[in-house]
Every structure is written in structure tokens, then in C-alpha cells.
Amino acid sequence: MKSNNLLLKKLSKHKPLVCLTANNTFIAKILDNFCDIILVGDSLGMVVYGEKTTQKVSIDMMINHGIAVRRGIKKSLLVVDMPRGTYEKSSSLALKNAKKIKKLTKCDALKLEGGSKISKTIKILVRNKIPVMSHIGLQPQKISNYKKYKVLGRLIKEEKKIINDLKSVEQAGSFSVVLESVTENLANKVNKISKIPVIGIGASNKCDGQILVTEDLLGLLNKSPKFAKNYENLKSKIAKAVKKYSRDVIKRNFPSKNYTYT
């Protein structure tokens, strides 16, 4: 691994970083056995609350879910997203909200979407002993319609911007960076020049680690992006279980004597 940052010393330097999202204690306990980093992502706005984008997620939502996930983690690094509107307007607002999230959730770090435009804010957070994971490439908080999500890096101007963003967040003090929805060629370039761990999501296997939304991995959603492999189809399995339960209740087969007090 390319960083000697204290936060990453407990992580393996010889294998890619395994990262997933969690939004409740139960899932966090399971992930903690396998993940280096667990993210309480603002994707919970979509996968928990049914929103079409992440833009309506509030700081209170992130704090409540962060507290729940913290209860389930013993060894993984816990990172919490700063939601849209909590850090972009000013560094002072960002610091105030970052301190609040970190204090209440007891997370190890915060994740901020953006590159050069928020480098000053990143510096201030880091100076105040708030570790920052950056997020460059596709930035969902800036997109009002998920249908507008696209792959970046095919145009020279996109490549230049992303590389510039990388250098900016590095210099500002971020300990790692999420790189989302870029071409394999650009991901390879970013990974080679980066001095901090690059965690990919839709950014090929060239990165130092990978992150997915856990609900995508488990096959719980109606539709997943191309880069998200469904390792299981829990949606179908849950439907089958509920169908069996419904049938047993209607036929008065449940609860049977095995599930009844005497």
C-alpha cells in the first residue's frame, strides 16, 4: 500500500482493500469480519429511504445510521459520508458539521465528494484532526438525476480534471480517495501517480481497493449499475420466504405447535 498514514497501519499492505457500505448494526457486524473499511454512505438515501438520488440525505440521517453501524464494528475502519449541503458553502460550516458527525458517530474518518474546489476545506479538517477520505470522478451529490450518471475519462478534459483533483486532495491531506465511474485506462493512470490508496467503484481492478453498495452486492435492488456485480439474489430469496409465510398464515399452518407456548 502506498500510504504510511496512521489510519491505514492496521490495514494490510499486501492485498487490495476490501470496502463495503453499511447502514445498520446487523449488516455492520457481518461486514466487520471481511472488510478493511466500512462506509456509511449517503447512498442510504436511495437504498433505505427510496429517494432517486443522494441529494436529500440529511446530516441527521447520516448520524443516526453512523451510530448504528458503529455498534456493529470492532476492527474495520469506519468512514461516514458528509451529505450534500454540509460542507460546500464554507470551510467553517464544514468543520462545524464534521466535528458533530465525528463526535456523535465515533467514526474514524469522513468522506467528502470533490477535488480542487474543496481542497481548502480538506486542509482545515485535517488540521483539526479529522481524517478525510476524498471522492473524485463521478460525484453523485452533484447529479440530480441518476440517469445522467456517466463514465468519465474518455475525454482529455475529463482526464485532466480528475488527475488535478487527485493531486489537490493529496496535497490537502486526504488519507485515501474513492475513484468512481472512470475508464480502466484512467484508473490505471490515477493509481500509478497517486501517493494515497485509491479505492475504486466502477474504476476497474487497477485500484488499491474496491467498494460497492452492499445492497447491490446482495442483489436487493431492482437495478444495479454495470460495475456492481450481484454476488447473491437476496431479493428473490426474501420474496420466496415471505410467500411461504403468507401461505402458512392463510392456511393456519403457522404458528404450529413447535412455535406455540403451552
Regions found by a protein language model. Give the residues of each.
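Alpha/beta enzyme core
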Residues: M1-E232, S236-T262
